[in-house]
């Protein structure tokens, strides 16, 4: 359909009078938002009959759109208000021209760098980097604030000072609560040292427990009845790296007073409310069946006290750690509950025995402290224990076996490295000996006499071949070797010189050759100047050719071409001569 050409202002009513409904819709799609909305929402009869007050009669400038087809497709979707607003928004986004209507907002053109912000966002990089620095600095500050010095830990009671003056030695109190509020791990077994302790409540941990004295449980209602341990939830975990184990003995008298025993008993009862109670005979069982399935061999009977000190703690720790590492992989199951009879309490370890007043006497109990790797900062250093007396829970044979196993574990990896690196040396060492090769008939068996005979045969062959060489006289007779005499050689040289000089003296000069006209080449009679008279510097008057020189050269060339130059008779007319 051909649209009428209008260069004047139109309103809604005049447009409907000129065009039908379809052409009016197409026309007003390119106009302002108000005109398009009125065209879409109102049927033609209503729009024609609408009152003049409802119609916006402000002039609208007609602007030609790029294409009408996509807008018609959008208009046919729906005739409700929401669809009309969506069509208006899409039309405004796709149009590059600004429609200066009162109800039409100006279209914001997209910059060519608009998509660059979606990909390249350096401000976010800076933010991420700063946040990362903040997190790391906060973590470092928190760790530094949590780390305390040795003096503060001694003041808090976590560590105890070591005195070497009067022979009194005290070790770190592992029963107190640690710095970060963590209790002892499942691998920490501790028999409480017989010293005054303050009952400190500890958080409930199913894997941490204390070992009480046998007399505490013997005071119960039925000392002869078997005591059952509650089932401990034990997780079968893969073998962990070996932990350092310290077995230290608190120094004290073999017999304690009733007051110290009562204080110890009250403190143990306060701690036992939050932990499992284990008998000393069960302590042996716990050492054999650890929380992770570890066998720790225990020594029966009272452990002897070493009077002058013990060996280096590192050796004991090393043997215990290697034993634990070896036995972790072998043990897979841990029994849930065990029962012991009261007879085992009296005869197993000899820890308690009846004393006067009917109260049991308490002997020294070794404290087994397994260092936990979780909280290394609050644990005293190993040199603090070097001078303290220790007790050994191993016999000499078991220690030797552990040391052998340790050495084999450490040397096996080294041996594998040596085997990998020195494979050539191993192959060379595996070479068969001479005797084996002789037995396999690879090398012939020879005695010393046979070797001497073989050498003599080779020598005779060489001498026979050397004797067959011709002598100098034979070579002279064959004219292969000429006899040399200095006088004769000098005479020959003189004769050669005389012959050459005679030939050179008989040579004709250039002038004689010119006169005889027997010059063969053009270069034979070219005069050569001496090096002293010749000057290679340019722009000298004697280096420039004059006109007469050039004419002489041209004449000489023409004569050469006409007389001396060999030219075929049929092509002689093609020879070019220089101007005279």
Curated annotation (Swiss-Prot):
One of its GO terms (biological process) is dendrite arborization. Residues 337-348 have a biased composition (Low complexity). RPEL repeats lie at residues 138-163, 422-447, 460-485, 498-523. Pfam families: RPEL. Residues 395-407 have a biased composition (Acidic residues). Changing residue 516 to A: Reduces affinity for actin. Residues 374-383, 471-494 have a biased composition (Basic and acidic residues). One of its GO terms (molecular function) is protein phosphatase inhibitor activity. The keyword Nucleus applies. Keywords: Actin-binding, Cytoplasm, Nucleus, Phosphoprotein, Protein phosphatase inhibitor, Repeat, Synapse. The modification Phosphothreonine is found at residue 104. Coiled coil: none annotated. The modification Phosphoserine is found at residues 67, 78, 467, 505. Disruption phenotype: PHACTR1 knockdown results in migration defects of cortical neurons. Neurons do not migrate to layers II-IV of the cortical plate but remain in the lower part and the intermediate zone. One of its GO terms (cellular component) is cytosol. A motif (Nuclear localization signal) lies at residues 108-129. Changing residue 496 to A: Reduces affinity for actin. It is found in: Cytoplasm; Synapse; Nucleus. Binds actin monomers (G actin) and plays a role in multiple processes including the regulation of actin cytoskeleton dynamics, actin stress fibers formation, cell motility and survival, formation of tubules by endothelial cells, and regulation of PPP1CA activity. Involved in the regulation of cortical neuron migration and dendrite arborization. Interacts (via RPEL repeats) with ACTA1 and PPP1CA; ACTA1 and PPP1CA compete for the same binding site. Belongs to the phosphatase and actin regulator family. Binds three actin monomers via the three C-terminal RPEL repeats. This is Phosphatase and actin regulator 1. The lineage of its organism: Eukaryota, Metazoa, Chordata, Craniata, Vertebrata.
């Amino acid at each position: 359909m051909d649209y009428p050409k209008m260069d004047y202002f139109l309103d809604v009513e005049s447009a409907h009078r000129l065009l039908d409904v379809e052409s009016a819709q197409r026309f007003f799609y390119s106009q302002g938002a108000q005109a398009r909305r009125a065209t879409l929402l109102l049927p033609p009869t209503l729009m024609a009959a609408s009152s003049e007050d409802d119609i916006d009669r402000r002039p609208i400038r007609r602007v030609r759109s790029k294409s009408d087809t996509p807008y018609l497709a959008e208009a046919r979707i729906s005739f409700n208000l929401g669809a009309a607003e969506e069509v208006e928004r899409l039309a405004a986004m796709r149009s590059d021209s600004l429609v200066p209507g009162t109800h039409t907002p100006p279209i914001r053109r997209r910059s060519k760098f608009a998509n660059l912000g979606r990909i390249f966002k350096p401000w976010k990089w800076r933010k991420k980097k700063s946040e990362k620095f903040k997190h790391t600095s906060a973590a470092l500050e928190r760790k530094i604030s949590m780390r305390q010095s040795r003096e503060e830990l001694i003041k808090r009671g976590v560590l105890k000072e070591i005195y070497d003056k009067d022979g009194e030695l005290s070790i770190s109190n592992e029963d107190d609560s640690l710095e970060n509020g963590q209790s002892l791990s499942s691998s920490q077994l501790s028999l409480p040292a017989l010293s005054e302790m303050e009952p400190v409540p500890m958080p409930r941990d199913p894997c941490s427990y204390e070992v009480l004295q046998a007399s505490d449980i013997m005071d119960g209602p039925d000392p002869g009845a078997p005591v059952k341990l509650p089932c401990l939830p034990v997780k079968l975990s893969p073998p962990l790296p070996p932990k350092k184990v310290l077995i230290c003995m608190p120094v004290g008298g073999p017999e304690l007073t009733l007051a110290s025993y009562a204080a110890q008993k009250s403190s143990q009862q306060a701690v036992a409310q939050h932990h499992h109670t284990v008998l000393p005979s069960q302590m042996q069982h716990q050492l054999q069946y650890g929380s992770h399935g570890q066998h720790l061999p225990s020594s029966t009977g009272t452990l002897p006290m070493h009077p002058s000190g013990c060996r280096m703690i590192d050796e004991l720790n090393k043997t215990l750690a290697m034993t634990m590492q070896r036995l972790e992989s072998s043990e897979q199951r841990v029994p849930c509950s065990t029962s012991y009879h009261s007879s085992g309490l009296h005869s197993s370890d000899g820890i308690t025995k009846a004393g006067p007043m009917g109260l049991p006497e308490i002997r020294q109990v070794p404290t087994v402290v397994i260092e936990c790797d979780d909280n290394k900062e609050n644990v005293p250093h190993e040199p603090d224990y070097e001078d303290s007396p220790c007790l050994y829970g191993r016999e000499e044979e078991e220690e030797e076996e552990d040391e052998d196993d340790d050495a084999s574990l450490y040397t096996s990896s080294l041996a594998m490295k040596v085997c990998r690196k020195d494979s050539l040396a191993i192959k060379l060492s595996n070479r068969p000996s001479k005797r084996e090769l002789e037995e396999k008939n690879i090398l012939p068996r020879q005695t010393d006499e046979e070797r001497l005979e073989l050498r003599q045969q080779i020598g005779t062959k060489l001498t026979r071949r050397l004797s067959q060489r011709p002598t100098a006289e034979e070579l002279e007779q064959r004219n292969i070797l000429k006899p040399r005499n200095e006088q004769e050689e000098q005479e020959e040289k003189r004769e050669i010189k005389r012959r050459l000089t005679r030939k050179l003296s008989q040579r004709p000069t250039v002038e004689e050759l010119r006169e005889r006209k027997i010059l063969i080449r053009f270069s034979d009679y070219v005069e050569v100047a001496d090096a002293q008279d010749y000057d290679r510097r340019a722009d000298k008057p004697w280096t420039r050719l004059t006109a007469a020189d050039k004419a002489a050269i041209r004449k000489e060339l023409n004569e050469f071409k006409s007389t001396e130059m060999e030219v075929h008779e049929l092509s002689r007319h093609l020879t070019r001569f220089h101007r005279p």
